[in-house]
């Protein structure tokens, strides 16, 4: 199906007038009774290389749809695949990547479930092959699939093996020349059977892997605590701290480097985002409560080459608390980060700002002055931001997946009907 390019001039605030132009391209209509299409931890919802862009979403009937656009084109080709997912559970996200030969890799529909992975039958094609294993081991209890591409065209694949409160982080690598997956780390971060790590990661332009995570002691989100960090210079084989001391693997509670100490019952959210700048310095986005007012605030944790720093991003005024299990319905989105030559962009959505696609922006972190940008003139419900990290690294281009979506608390369905799916480009 050919879908013509629909450019919508976005209503921007006066503070955004000096920013690059924004455009929306409609690519289809997606399931919206949960946030399964719009969770921040989709790795990735939209991706690209020098030749093509690709995006994936569940349609109104819960079928996986793949959209391709040739770079420079005004149209998207959208294909409904043979695969369906349990869209009632927002954990069952679709994650995609393009390897160095242009083949699309996809993992989807997993929340403590057997691996569902397939590859396209041809380069830049949406005809997907049969489900297949990767390594064939440790693939029975998978959650949070996330792909990353290396500069030579190989892929990395991270996932949690095990359940909330007692899972381990696993890492595979796809060898482009051999066209097969290999295990790199069986247990990169070990919860020791008592806790698990909720990670976020970023592969920088030099193939350095930046990994950060919070610990969770039980299934209850209120037991999230602390923010930890590790870095790999060799595609996940060895890992080190910011002082260059090497980790003995697996990393545990007692051996981890702590970027920021955050106690339990601080409304600390898991599965947020991180990035790195051109110098390889890591930036981590999250939110938590740290004062008597009980209002969670957006935070930025970053390393400047000498030490870890932490600051509040903007100012929120709506109180809420995090407790219990499942997908939480809260008034703010988990944030997404982009670092460009123009500074730091901190993407979010908050009820008190009209639930629109929004961002805080600063050119100088040390000033702690953040400019508020409104990027849509319409609300997006419970949407969370996910972006094309390849476009960001390749050409400093910010591309977001945008869709209005509802979400009930604890995996409950909302009454939100199917909604338009857009790709937003910010120059």
Language-model-detected regions and their locations in the chain:
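Hydrophobic h-region of N-terminal signal peptides that target proteins for export
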Residues: 9-17
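Extracellular, repeat-based ectodomains that mediate carbohydrate processing or recognition
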Residues: 19-427
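Sec-dependent signal peptide recognition
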Residues: 2-9
């Amino acid at each position: 199906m050919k879908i013509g390019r629909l450019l919508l001039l976005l209503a921007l605030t006066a503070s955004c007038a000096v920013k690059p132009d924004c455009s929306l391209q409609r690519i289809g209509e997606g399931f919206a009774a949960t946030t399964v299409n719009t969770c921040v931890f989709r790795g990735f919802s939209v991706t690209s290389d020098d030749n093509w862009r690709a995006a994936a979403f569940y349609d109104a009937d819960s079928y996986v749809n793949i959209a391709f656009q040739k770079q420079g084109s005004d149209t998207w080709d959208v294909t409904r695949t043979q695969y369906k997912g349990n869209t009632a559970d927002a954990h069952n996200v679709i994650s995609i990547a393009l390897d160095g030969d242009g083949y699309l890799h996809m993992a989807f529909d997993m929340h403590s479930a057997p691996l569902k992975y397939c590859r396209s039958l041809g380069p830049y094609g949406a005809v997907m092959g049969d489900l297949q294993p990767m390594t064939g081991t440790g693939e029975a209890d998978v959650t949070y699939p996330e792909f990353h591409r290396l500069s030579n065209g190989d892929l990395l694949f991270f996932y949690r093996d095990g359940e909330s409160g007692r899972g381990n982080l696993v890492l595979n690598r796809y060898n482009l020349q051999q066209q097969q997956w290999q295990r790199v780390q069986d247990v990169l971060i070990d919860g020791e059977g008592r806790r698990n790590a909720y990670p976020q990661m970023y592969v920088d332009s030099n193939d350095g892997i930046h990994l950060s995570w919070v610990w969770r002691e039980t299934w209850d989100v209120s037991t999230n605590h602390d923010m930890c960090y590790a870095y790999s210079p060799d595609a996940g084989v060895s890992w080190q701290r910011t002082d260059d001391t090497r980790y003995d693997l697996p990393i545990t509670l007692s051996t981890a480097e702590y970027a920021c100490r955050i106690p339990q019952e601080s409304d600390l959210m898991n599965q947020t985002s991180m990035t790195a700048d051109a110098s390889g310095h890591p930036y981590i986005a999250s939110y938590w409560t740290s004062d008597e007012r009980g209002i969670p605030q957006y935070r930025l944790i970053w390393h400047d080459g000498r030490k870890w720093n932490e600051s509040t991003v903007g100012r929120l005024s709506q109180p809420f608390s995090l407790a219990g299990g499942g997908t939480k319905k809260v008034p703010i989105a988990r944030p997404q980060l982009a670092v460009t030559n123009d500074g730091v962009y901190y993407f979010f959505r908050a009820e008190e700002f009209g639930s629109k696609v929004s961002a805080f922006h600063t050119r100088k972190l040390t000033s702690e002055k953040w400019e508020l940008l409104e990027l849509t003139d319409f609300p997006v419900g419970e949407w969370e931001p996910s972006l094309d990290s390849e476009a960001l690294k390749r050409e400093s281009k910010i591309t977001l997946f945008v869709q209005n979506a509802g979400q009930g608390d604890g995996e409950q369905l909302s009454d939100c009907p199917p909604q338009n799916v857009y790709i937003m480009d910010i120059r």
